[in-house]
Amino acid sequence: MFILNHAASLMGISVAGTEPTSMLMMDSTAVIHHELFIQQMIQNSRPLFQAFQPCDFTDMLQNICTFHLSGAFYAYLPSPAFLTARESLLRDILSENGISEQDIQQYLTLNAVFRADISHSQSEQTAPQKPFIYLFQLEEMQRRVQGDTFVSWSLSLLHGHDIYVSKKQYAQELRDLADDLSRHSNMRVAFVSETDDIALPTINCWCKQNQWMVQMDRAGFRFSNEMEMIAAASMVLDDCLQKIPPVRKDPQSVQKFLLELAAELER
């Protein structure tokens, strides 16, 4: 239904087994009635996503930690997000960027809460264990090898200014990721290539099947616990995983690539 400034209402009706029908109404009474109907629908609706500010990140993380349903965990990231790096590495990055000790402690607290929920997903005792899947963008990971530093989206959004990551720190994150892959049997890492013709948006996305989804891009953070959205995202990400060639998701091949990339960064 389209309504033009109290003047006209264009309504389309589609019933199974029949041709779609469109009706243009100019009668002011009918148009006002349609406007009231739409306003009522909006008032009774709720947003699919809730945008939140970086200062509300702790509350959001504590909220998602209250969800305890079993389900696969998907993380689609252009490259590893340093928001969830190990504590020692995160402290090193923040210190080298001149962040105050007070702010460092705040970010370490966020990191601990987020990693605790991730750790719960990695170590679920369900039988069989639900998969924990990282999908990274291959070319983006390779591009970050070329410069001396690059900007961490997640940390920069939280701090409000650019936070830079060095080659050495990037290499350490890749080694930590390879280590996690060897320690968790239900963890999988796969690389999406630009040549795969898989339509995925340029966002960071963490999605816990049947529970919640968090998205992050340059505009900020968004949270959803709408089951329809989460189910759709889970299906898209799982379909993406199935389309990736075996060589880019085989655990041994992936671990070898991560360690080789780390070694290249440290030369």
Where are the regions a protein language model picked out?
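Charge-biased C-terminal accessory regions appended to nucleic-acid-, cytoskeletal NTPase
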Residues: 235-267
